[in-house]
Amino acid sequence: VGFKAGVKDYKLNYYTPDYETKDTDILAAFRVTPQPGVPPEEAGAAVAAESSTGTWTAVWTDGLTSLDRYKGRCYHIEPVAGEENQYIAYVAYPLDLFEEGSVTNMFTSIVGNVFGFKALRALRLEDLRIPPAYSKTFQGPPHGIQVERDKLNKYGRPLLGCTIKPKLGLSAKNYGRAVYECLRGGLDFTKDDENVNSQPFMRWRDRFLFCAEALYKAQAETGEIKGHYLNATAGTCEEMIKRAVFARELGVPIVMHDYLTGGFTANTSLAHYCRDNGLLLHIHRAMHAVIDRQKNHGIHFRVLAKALRMSGGDHIHAGTVVGKLEGERDITLGFVDLLRDDFVEKDRSRGIYFTQDWVSLPGVLPVASGGIHVWHMPALTEIFGDDSVLQFGGGTLGHPWGNAPGAVANRVALEACVRARNEGRDLAREGNEIIREAAKWSPELAAACEVWKAIKFEFPAMDTL
């Protein structure tokens, strides 16, 4: 019969160290911690098998297909330096295993099942190489960085934002007032907090109306294009699209979505709607730390970032390197480049395991947000460069004189940093001096400098190589 029942070692079929990877393969780098007594080759092969064609025992229907054509292969294993019993297992998946244009299906296949596997003590997906043959089946970001700049008519500097706080409990009218003050003071964007959806104290439609009013008023008074990220995240996809439609009817420039809690299917639907209707799409990564914070188990954020670029979003939160939230500098800049650039070289010192060629997929603006204030401005300008959104929530609304002066302080600080950089000054070394000079001409900035002169969030970064 050619069929032998029973349980076989995975490595007989799925560990293939002499395999030459194809240009069309999806490649994955897993950090594997095998259970005691399980050899690394067997653990790596088990991951390849369980995330592709394998199951725990030989089945006769294997004979009805070509395993060689469809199986995932563990083609290389290396020990992780400085860690006991941790290995990087490289797995190649044939392109045919995945549905075109579906991030949902890609994740269901690659990480859907293997993470509960008994032979592994822990498993983390560190990186994915998405071949152009697959990325070309995705629309990607609704607009991308250049189109966004053209829509907003803002060039040569990072964009400024502010999350409206307190995040929960304001009425729609008071919320709109805070939006107006921030935009009037000089910010480009204000933002719904990720958990502002449609609660009893502020229903979504009321918020959309008051925010649109605030936006148009600030626009008329400043002569600059303004935006407020209206959070369209909802309990059903239909309701989410309904909110996006209403935002479009109001004529506002941008909506927002929580892509991990909302889910990739909903996110991709919204991204398609946004491109078809000229809306920018801001993405918040609520829930990411549940998935990406543990060093030895889960999925690294650089994979979630790549997935978002495929699913679609024009902005995504990406850590600050300097504020209250997670992010080690080189690693953060690694996935910031993966979001913005067309082509990123493999660079293990930045956590990038594969060379990634995005071809013509539009880029995503990284958003730095969380515990940042005016004293951070030189560092942020230097680290993130022009193509970024810098968001100061408390760093705007916490200003002793109010929201609009808080916005003024941030705008003055940003313009000072950009100007100093363009004159060739070293922001890393002279940053504090640049802010102090600017504060002489701006009482709002001087007051902000005084309030936050001693604030530090000093904890070691968790996201290390």
From Swiss-Prot:
Modified positions (N6-carboxylysine) in chain numbering: 191
Entry-linked CDD domains: RuBisCO_large_I (cd08212)
Cofactor note: Binds 1 Mg(2+) ion per subunit.
Post-translational modification comment from the UniProt entry: The disulfide bond which can form in the large chain dimeric partners within the hexadecamer appears to be associated with oxidative stress and protein turnover.
UniProt record, GO biological process: photorespiration; reductive pentose-phosphate cycle
Annotated active site: 165, 284
PROSITE patterns linked: RUBISCO_LARGE
Subcellular location: Plastid, Chloroplast
Example of a GO cellular component annotation carried by this entry: chloroplast
Chief location category: plastid
Reactions mediated catalytically: 2 (2R)-3-phosphoglycerate + 2 H(+) = D-ribulose 1,5-bisphosphate + CO2 + H2O; D-ribulose 1,5-bisphosphate + O2 = 2-phosphoglycolate + (2R)-3-phosphoglycerate + 2 H(+)
GO molecular function terms noted in the UniProt entry: magnesium ion binding; monooxygenase activity; ribulose-bisphosphate carboxylase activity
More info: The basic functional RuBisCO is composed of a large chain homodimer in a 'head-to-tail' conformation. In form I RuBisCO this homodimer is arranged in a barrel-like tetramer with the small subunits forming a tetrameric 'cap' on each end of the 'barrel'.
Protein name as annotated: Ribulose bisphosphate carboxylase large chain
Species name: Eucommia ulmoides
